Amino acid sequence: MMWELLKLRTVLLLALSTVSAAQAGQTEVPDELGAMTLDARVDESVMGINDKLVKWRRDLHAHPELSNREFRTAEVIAAHLRKLGMTVTTDVAHTGVVGYLRGRSEHPLVALRSDMDALPVTEQVDLAFASTVKGEYLGQEVGVMHACGHDNHMAMLMGAAEVLAGMADEIPGSIKFIFQPAEEGPPEGEQGGAKLMVKEGVLQDVDAIFGLHVFPSALGTVQYRTGGIMASSDTFKIKVKGRQTHGAVPWGGVDPIVVAAQIVLGLQTIPSRQLDSTLTPSIVTIGKIQGGVRSNIIPDDVEMLGDRKSVV
């Protein structure tokens, strides 16, 4: 958990420094002496909740929930924020939770954000807190796992809430804690995620916002840059329509599986041959192919689900 503590500490320092600087009308962080004092206090507070961070993260990891279905997760988070004396709003963008910590003044208002949802992935490790949860995704029963680190993010933001709540009387501003559902995308036919949270006004009056994502980088490092740092993602569906026939007489129909295979290979030439990868990093992935019911019957159609990521 040491890397989680380090990143939690970074978020806390960013939030407190931003509030202090904005309150003073500055564009830079507070003076060096003040920053050192803040640094030491945050270090002490963060180390004091180490055991809680481990407990929260393992509990959340053992009970993952899919997008727009984060019901237990929301209850755990809301109960924690209420225990800290915050004003808590639930059911934001379906299952989102927002906590408000009033400091010495309403503004500057700095927001800290975490995602909440898990992925339709079966966990394959033998740990006491490994997920055994099953869920439904695209009409199929699937394993559910926090395979993208959102359990870490939630534990860190719960920790940030606890530390900052203990310093509320000294914060020259206020803090909003945003727990966002459906970061992985809402179920088909539903709204959700960041867009719905913004639509419902979660960022109203917010002066600055911070978020992070865990990454398998060197311990004790934080990566950042001006502008975009994470890739944007768009999903797509392709349906190839053929004509059913027996596998013994493929010339009697149109084989959509062969066509689908050509499409999969052809798509890979877009990022590798049509885009300058030194200027426009991009990836195209086909994550699901579904078609046919028997080994010797050429089906009528094949459906593919894919994802493209690009840095803009």
Spans of features found by a protein language model:
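Histidine/acidic-residue-rich, glycine-tolerant segments that coordinate divalent metal ions
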Residues: 134-145, 151-152, 163-164, 169-288, ...
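N-terminal secretory signal peptides that target proteins for export/translocation
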Residues: 1-6
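Short Gly/Ser/Thr- and Asp/Glu-enriched loop/turn motifs at secondary-structure junctions
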Residues: 92-96, 281, 299-301
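Bacterial N-terminal signal peptides
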Residues: 7-20
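Hydrophobic beta-strand positions in extracellular immunoglobulin-like domains
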Residues: 101, 240-242, 308
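Acidic/His- and Gly-rich active-site-bordering loop/insert found
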Residues: 28-146, 152-176
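Conserved small/polar residues in nucleotide/adenosyl-binding loops
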Residues: 311-312
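Boundary at the C-terminal end of the N-terminal hydrophobic targeting segment
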Residues: 21-27
